[in-house]
Amino acid sequence: MAYITKRGNSYSVRYTYEDEHGKSCDKWESFPTKEEATNRKKQIEHELAAGTFLIPSSVTVAEFLMDWLPKQCSKHKWAPKTYESNLSTIQNLIIPYIGSMEMQKLKPYHMENLYTTLSKTPCGSYIEGKKQELTEKQKQRFLSGTTIHEVHRLLGTAFQYAVEWGILAKSPVPVDSPKKSTQERTIWTVEEMRAALDSMEDPILHLAVHLTLVGALREGEIVGLTPEDIDFDAADGIGTFCINKSMQRVRKEALNQVDDGCIIKVFPDKLERSTTSLILKSTKTASSCRTIFMTSALKEELKKWLNQLAADEMKDPTRYHDSGMLFRLPNGLAVEPVLIRKKFLKWQDAHPEFPRIVFHGLRHSSATYQLMISGGDVKAVQGTTGHATADMLVNTYAHIQQSSRVELGRKFEEGFYAKQESPSPQAVPAAGEPTISMTALLELLKNADPEVKAQLRLALLT
């Protein structure tokens, strides 16, 4: 039962409820008019009778998210990078803007305002929750739609738990999510890949790039290889290497929160009071574990590299620190992913004739080339790239190089507009005349440029 009391110029609604521990609590809510107080009284009595009453809570967005995050990490056995990424999103993209707001006062328009604010926010405005001083150039680079979409996704998941936990009656996160960025990936042609590899003189960089181009590897997978992953005699002497581990540098805070079941090894810190750790972990999904077939050139390079590792150890065994990894420095310590990226950036600075791409772009370049030479055999390429599903592979590499589009257009024109000697649908083309089967035509149309599809529709209707 709820009661209305006039207190000065306002009206108060007093009611009693049981908290989450079953304890009886009194609550007062003030309203400027009697009408508002009456409406609230009716609402409270209805919810108490129906068992849908929401226990008043002053918990803030920041308090809730920092309580929710480790619980989800433990429940879903997140990898360190997953925890670190979500923590960064909360600390840098959510708490600075709505962290002090009470959960029960959040409305959908607060979420929309957050998305609008983030769309006008420069990248790196906050790091570990601390406001950063940006240069004028840095202020011109804004958060992407994909980043804002990730904020929406995280809040949608978190606030749904808030509903289940009885903190919110319903989630304030809008149904419509911010649109992801659709910027086309920059990749290299096969000629550029070959020329770039030939120009790389640094042995560590050369081998890393060679492995990436053959196997479409991720950076962490490259430096996560061990000599035991290599089998020169497998596949009737072709040779293979297995991808089943990944190397990452993660914050110690994340390492302390995650389930250590996926952690294979934690490398010793190089610096005292380091806030991060270098780890070797199992690959992120079952599909990421895969076997890659060597090329003869890669096979020879790997043999020479292993011989060099043995020679390095023999030079000074007492000072050699055998990390057990395939990629090692001359002193035996493991090569980190960041070193590969730095070496690649240095090489790019010295070779401006090549299109500028990030190191991960080599993986995209390799996967795209393999899709081309396989005739679009998605399942075969998926086995190499380690994508979880064929759809993910197709969606990731939906782009096609300009040369392929020109060739596709040429084949379409030759096949579609080919003249037949007889109007019969069973007519046999003259010798040397371009032909195209219905199956091939359908395959071409499925991958055709939108303009070509539009031309076909027009031709069919006229």
Where are these regions (language model features)?
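Short, Arg/Lys-rich segments that mark the N-terminal edge of DNA/RNA- and chromatin-recognition modules
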Residues: 1-32, 240, 244-274
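N-terminal core-binding DNA-recognition domain of tyrosine site-specific recombinases/integrases
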Residues: 3, 17, 70-161, 182, ...
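N-terminal DNA-binding module of tyrosine recombinases/phage integrases
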Residues: 7-112, 128, 310-322, 402, ...
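Short, basic (Lys/Arg/His-rich) helix/loop patches that form interaction surfaces
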Residues: 123-127, 198, 202-203, 215, ...
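Basic, Lys/Arg- and aromatic-enriched nucleic-acid-binding interface segment
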Residues: 127-145, 149-151, 164, 168-227, ...
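Catalytic-site neighborhood detector that most strongly recognizes the C-terminal catalytic loop/helix
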Residues: 179-180, 187, 245-249, 385-411
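Short, polar N-cap/turn motifs at the start of nucleic acid-interacting alpha helices
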Residues: 229-237, 375-398
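C-terminal secondary-structure termini that scaffold catalytic or DNA-interacting sites
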Residues: 232-235, 245-289, 298, 410-462
